[in-house]
């Protein structure tokens, strides 16, 4: 454990941020999985609706610094290509 007061505060802040980031990443995975399942089922309307949610979550995560903006763009692009192939 840290001895310096500011470092003790940073440990708590980092722990909160870590928990928040884990929750955001979990939501991302769920949204992407829902999109991929709709694509696998061949349901274009459901896939597009799920993609809209996933794209929004990806953009928010990138904006918050949870994932890199290029990673968000790559994931959105991959999902869009799969949906357009339906």
From Swiss-Prot:
Name of the protein: Small ribosomal subunit protein bS20
Spell out the GO cellular component terms annotated for this protein, sorted alphabetically and separated by semicolons.
cytosol; small ribosomal subunit
Keyword Nucleus listed: no
Q: What does this protein do?
A: Binds directly to 16S ribosomal RNA.
**Any GO BP:** translation
Q: Which HAMAP family match?
A: Ribosomal_bS20 (MF_00500)
Q: Which NCBIfam families match?
A: S20 (TIGR00029)
Question: Which superkingdom, per the lineage?
Answer: Bacteria
> Matching SUPFAM superfamilies, A to Z?
Ribosomal protein S20
The reply to whether RNA-binding figures as a keyword in the UniProt entry is yes
Q: What's a single GO MF annotation on this record?
A: structural constituent of ribosome
Keywords in alphabetical order? Ribonucleoprotein, Ribosomal protein, RNA-binding, rRNA-binding
Q: Which InterPro entries match?
A: Ribosomal_bS20, Ribosomal_bS20_sf
Instruction: Please state which protein family the record places this protein in.
Output: Belongs to the bacterial ribosomal protein bS20 family.
Q: Which organism is it from?
A: Bifidobacterium longum (strain NCC 2705)
């Amino acid at each position: 454990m840290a001895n310096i007061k500011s470092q003790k505060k940073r440990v708590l802040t980092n722990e909160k941020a870590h928990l928040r980031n884990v929750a955001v990443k979990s939501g991302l995975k769920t949204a992407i999985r829902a999109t991929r399942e709709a694509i696998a089922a061949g349901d274009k309307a459901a896939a597009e609706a799920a993609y809209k949610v996933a794209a929004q979550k990806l953009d928010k995560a990138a904006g918050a610094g949870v994932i890199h903006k290029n990673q968000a763009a790559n994931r959105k692009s991959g999902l869009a290509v799969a949906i357009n192939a339906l």
